[in-house]
């Protein structure tokens, strides 16, 4: 497609952390399943209405590349049917979702834990034909940043939102979905103000508001991989991309399994605490996310658990959304749609992972994260990040293997999304029951296979019944052992 010129009201440069090399060719899709028949036109019109309000117009702008290679957004004076705020496509199928060859393969809740196929098989439901695959596809066309694809069955609806990662992280899209729901319900007055289009809270991060905060040294500075060791790490990582394949699957853990894992973790922590402090009965706190992370780390290490690999160092990397952690920079009741997720690190080894209890490992993860989330430590981490060329920090050793986690549980998508004004009629209720117009299931995928999606877990969160869904990318040899262990779970 050739680039189309439209009257432009404003041109806004991308922020450094949005225009990152690692984000440019990541085009994401979030697919939500509703067991209701939804009005596709109402979904489209309400989204376009939101993107015509105030600073929300920025999300309807077109991505362009400057002569120096940097990205910017061209915000039109107004949107028209020929140049809409969001790209819309609709597929209407005259059958029930379970009668469709691909629809019947969508994951559903069961009594026992289960491994499902990768969500990548559902590309047919995710986007229109010939979707954008790279940032260049946006720069060289009139495509809006946001794509809306609706698949209508006679008893259910799939709603997919696609966007370039340069526009936002998952929390930003959650904010979009919440405000979209408000417009759909005729509550435009409740739509949050989107942050100023030409500023970014992270610009003032290091000094703090007023520049009065004292700079601390980052707690993990001595563990940074730099110099020749950094070069070795990069070479090893490139080698794994070339020679170590990855296989993606979706992990389903029922609510009762999560309760059992959490009870196991808490009981082992109480036992450990009583050994150190006799008579102490208080349970150290660990969250569902801590326990799931610890369990997933153990699953990822199963195929490496031998005497030869026990000393293999691992760096557990958790994504941190800094919006709620920096209240002096992020204003309340203001929407921030962008990339504000950064890394927290936990150092360990395969041997330590396999020899410690689930509770101890979960507590280790939680303790290391708590040490890194104070505002002064976040600022110290950003100071180190600004010194790097590649826009990422490597913690551990030159031979450390990264294990990456992104936890979307706090987005609470099945709770905060409310498309009930678009419900034409309820469909047949499945294993998971939700209120009309609320999702019963969701997954994410990339429009193009990502080589960097490896040794990673995306905790998608809970469905309305409290069951957890987790997407994972691991070497093929890891999955038989994981399946075997999952069969032992309650």
From Swiss-Prot:
The keyword Ribosomal protein does not apply. Its EC number is 2.3.1.-. It is an enzyme of class 2 (transferase). InterPro entries: CAT-like_dom_sf (IPR023213), Plant_Fungal_Acyltransferase (IPR050317). Disruption phenotype: Accumulates fusicoccin J. The keyword Acyltransferase applies. Pfam families: Transferase (PF02458). Pathway: Mycotoxin biosynthesis. Optimum pH is 8.5. Optimum temperature is 35 degrees Celsius. The active site is at 165 (proton acceptor). It comes from the Eukaryota. GO terms for molecular function: acyltransferase activity, transferring groups other than amino-acyl groups. Keywords: Acyltransferase, Transferase. O-acetyltransferase; part of the 2 gene clusters that mediate the biosynthesis of fusicoccins, diterpene glucosides that display phytohormone-like activity and function as potent activators of plasma membrane H(+)-ATPases in plants by modifying 14-3-3 proteins and cause the plant disease constriction canker. Belongs to the plant acyltransferase family. This is O-acetyltransferase PaAT-2. It comes from Phomopsis amygdali. The lineage of its organism: Eukaryota, Fungi, Dikarya, Ascomycota, Pezizomycotina. The gene is PaAT-2.
């Amino acid at each position: 497609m050739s680039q189309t010129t439209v009257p432009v009201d404003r041109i806004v440069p991308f922020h450094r952390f949005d225009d990152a090399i690692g984000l440019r060719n990541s085009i994401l899709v979030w697919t939500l399943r509703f067991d209701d028949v939804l009005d596709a036109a109402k979904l489209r019109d309400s989204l376009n209405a939101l993107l015509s309000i105030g600073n929300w117009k920025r999300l309807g702008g077109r991505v362009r590349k400057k002569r120096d290679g940097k990205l910017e957004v061209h915000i039109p004076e107004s949107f028209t049917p020929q140049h809409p705020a969001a790209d819309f496509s609709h597929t209407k199928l005259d059958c029930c979702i379970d009668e469709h060859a691909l629809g019947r393969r969508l994951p559903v809740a069961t009594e026992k834990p289960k491994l499902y196929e990768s969500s990548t098989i559902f590309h047919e439901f995710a986007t229109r034909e010939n979707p954008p695959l790279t940032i260049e596809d946006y720069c060289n066309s009139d495509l809006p940043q946001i794509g809306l694809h609706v698949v209508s069955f006679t008893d259910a609806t799939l709603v997919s939102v696609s966007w370039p990662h340069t526009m936002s992280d998952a929390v930003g899209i959650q904010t979009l979905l919440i405000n979209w729901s408000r417009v759909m319900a005729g509550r435009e007055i409740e739509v949050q103000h989107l942050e100023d289009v030409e500023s970014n809270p992270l610009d003032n991060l290091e000094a703090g508001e007023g520049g009065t905060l004292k700079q601390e040294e980052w707690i993990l500075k001595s563990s940074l991989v730099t110099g020749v060791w950094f070069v070795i790490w990069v070479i090893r990582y490139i080698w794994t991309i070339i020679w170590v394949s990855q296989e993606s699957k979706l992990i389903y853990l029922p609510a009762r399994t999560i309760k059992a894992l959490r009870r196991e973790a808490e009981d082992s922590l109480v036992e450990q605490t009583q050994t150190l402090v006799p008579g102490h009965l208080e349970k150290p706190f660990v969250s569902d996310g801590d326990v799931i992370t610890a369990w997933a780390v153990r699953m990822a290490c199963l195929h490496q658990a031998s005497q030869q690999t026990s000393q293999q160092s691992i760096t557990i990397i958790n994504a941190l959304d800094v919006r709620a952690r920096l209240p002096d920079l992020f204003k309340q009741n203001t929407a921030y749609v962008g990339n504000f997720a950064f890394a927290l690190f936990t150092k360990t080894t395969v041997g330590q992972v396999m020899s410690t209890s689930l509770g101890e490992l979960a507590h280790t993860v939680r303790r290391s994260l708590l040490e890194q989330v104070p505002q002064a430590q976040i600022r110290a981490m950003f100071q180190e990040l600004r010194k790097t060329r590649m826009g990422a920090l490597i913690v551990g050793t030159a031979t450390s293997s990264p294990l990456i986690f992104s936890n979307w549980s706090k987005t609470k998508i099945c709770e905060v999304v409310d498309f009930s004004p678009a419900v034409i009629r309820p469909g047949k209720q499945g294993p998971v029951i939700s209120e009309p117009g609320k999702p019963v299931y969701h997954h994410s995928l990339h429009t193009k296979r990502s080589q960097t999606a490896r040794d990673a877990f995306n905790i998608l969160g809970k469905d309305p019944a409290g069951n957890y869904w987790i997407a994972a990318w691991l070497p093929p040899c890891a999955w038989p052992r994981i399946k075997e262990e999952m069969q032992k779970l309650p």
